[in-house]
């Protein structure tokens, strides 16, 4: 369909005139600061639906009702719904368990049995503290971060490289879009390891076609778990992440997660090798957790969202 240029005069006209604003992002507005005042202080009296772009597991205070005044907050599981409904302060009926629209497409996938996807999330403190204006200083500061050192070390792990060579495996490294400006510092020269970026690679396609996922705290783990595929959480900086990015919520990765939690590259490599020797088959304990957590598991997510928005 037709696309309106972001931040343009036309964007403002449509934004102000619309009776309903539907977005997967809280910040999907012509100007975040001005629109915050218009919406939160009741100047703009439209209905706003927050479709979300991932299942919430952490305590995201910026999504509390006093900071959004959204009319519909979409959740995807009972546990997520209960957490948001009980904690975020929304009026009764505003938080609904409908499922992410994109989940409809996750039931139709063709998996590449030899593809390993490494997809970590971003770090707020890295993005905010490292200036992009000075290239040399940016490179120096980024390459001093644990984020760079740990992920770079995993991509260059000799034992992992030897194993993927011997078994014709392929690794795709695609971090969160907020980190793509730093991709140029990951110097990986190997035909079986690809440092991928948008728009050359589509996130949902990578998730659907990959046999196994290595991530950290990213909500893409939920998409992968939804498809009943094996994954591992590489959480080498858990304490700093909780202090500087997102605080812990209802979800305990070790007790509730859909894969093991590792803190060293050796543990990740060990797990990948062991899993491959098992044919990349998911373990029963994680399949059982899938059945308990995803109480909505069908292709009617878009339908439920559509009906809820019409009734909003």
Predicted features along the sequence, with ranges:
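Short, charged/polar "capping" segments at the starts of alpha-helices
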Residues: 30-33, 81-84, 105, 126-127, ...
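C-terminal alpha-helical cap of glycosyltransferases
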Residues: 298-312
